[in-house]
Amino acid sequence: TGEQYFCGYPFFVNENVLTPRADTEILVEEALKKLKTGDSILDMCTGSGCILLSLLLMKEGCRGTGVDLSEKALQVAEKNRRKLLSEKTDCVFLQSNLFDALPEEKFSLVVSNPPYIKTADIEELMPEVKDHEPRMALDGEADGLFFYRKIAGEAKRYLTKGGYILFEIGFDQ
C-alpha cells in the first residue's frame, strides 16, 4: 500500500492491485514504438492503470480504455487517472470480464500484462508476491496461458487494420 514509481510517474497502489515492476516498463517502451498521435489503446487487465496511463502521458493525443474484472482495482486506476492525467485526456476504465462488457470499438493497440503464473506454481512464489499481491492478478490457470489465448482470440474483432497486440509474458513461456 502506498506509492510506486513506474516509468517515472508516481502511482498509488494498495492490496487490490499488482505492484508495478520495472520489468513491465519494457512493455511500455515497446508499445511507444508502435503508437502514433491519435491512436487508441486498450489495456486488458489494467489493475492500477500504470501501463495505460504511462502510455497516455508519454504519447500525447492518444486515447485509452482500461479494462479489469476487479471493481477495487478499477477504483485504484481511476484514482491514478485523476492524479496523473489532464481532464482533456480521453481515458476511461470499465469493469468487464475481458471483452464481455466492452462496446464494439476499434483500437490501434491492445496491451496487457495478464495473470500468467501457473496455478500450481503460485505457492512457490516469493512470500512478498504470493502473500501480498491479489491472487486474481497472478493466476493464469493450469498452464499460465489462459488469458493470452482469450485475449489474442478475441482481440482481432477490436483491432484496427494494422493494429498490434503486445503482452508481458513470463520468462518460461
Model-derived features with residue positions:
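Short glycine/threonine-rich catalytic loop with a Thr-x-Gly-x-Asp
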Residues: 20, 47, 144
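Mobile active-site "lid"/loop adjacent to the S-adenosyl-L-methionine
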Residues: 116-146
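Conserved Class I SAM-dependent methyltransferase catalytic core
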Residues: 142-173
